[in-house]
Amino acid sequence: MAAPAEIKTEYLLPNHEGPWTLDDVLSLPEDNSQRIELVDGMLYVSPLGTAAHQRLVFEASYALRGACPKEFETTIELNVQFDGDRLFIPDFTVLKKRGAKGLTVPAADVLLIGEVISRSTKVKDVVVKRQVYAEAGVSYYLIIDPAKDVPKATLLELGEEGKYVEIARSENGVLTIERPFPVTIELPS
């Protein structure tokens, strides 16, 4: 029987009793190998996306940045703070104003959130985050699904009843939207 390989402790979370708080999470050492998000005292830890995932994030955020009106700002992997002890790191965001500072940005400052889903994050992205983003009043939620031969994207807009409504869907790997501003996003396979 072989001895277990040595575990690199820099990638392990410290022992912690009770629910996690926002302060607990923000005091963790920086770790570029994984995402650590917080919902109601529980941590969601996931690896960074694959190369295909990162290409989709880059192309979507690059297209949004190119079309973005000057008063808005496009970012990637930003700590977005929601009511209570909730912290998500969306793949990309469009902020309502330029020049965000600090370790976190309040959800009230976010116009659009984009997520590229994967097998390990699908339920969180499509169910949990959708609900939290809607409750926080984030106007637009762009979901990109790379799981098909041709990636698919869906843009949701927050409706009057506080629920997201689909307003655009990609065709043949291309998403064209008019709101929150006109842009065409080509989704690489």
Which role fits each region the language model picked out?
Residues 1-189:
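Gly/Pro/Ser/Thr-rich low-complexity, intrinsically disordered segments predominantly at protein N-termini
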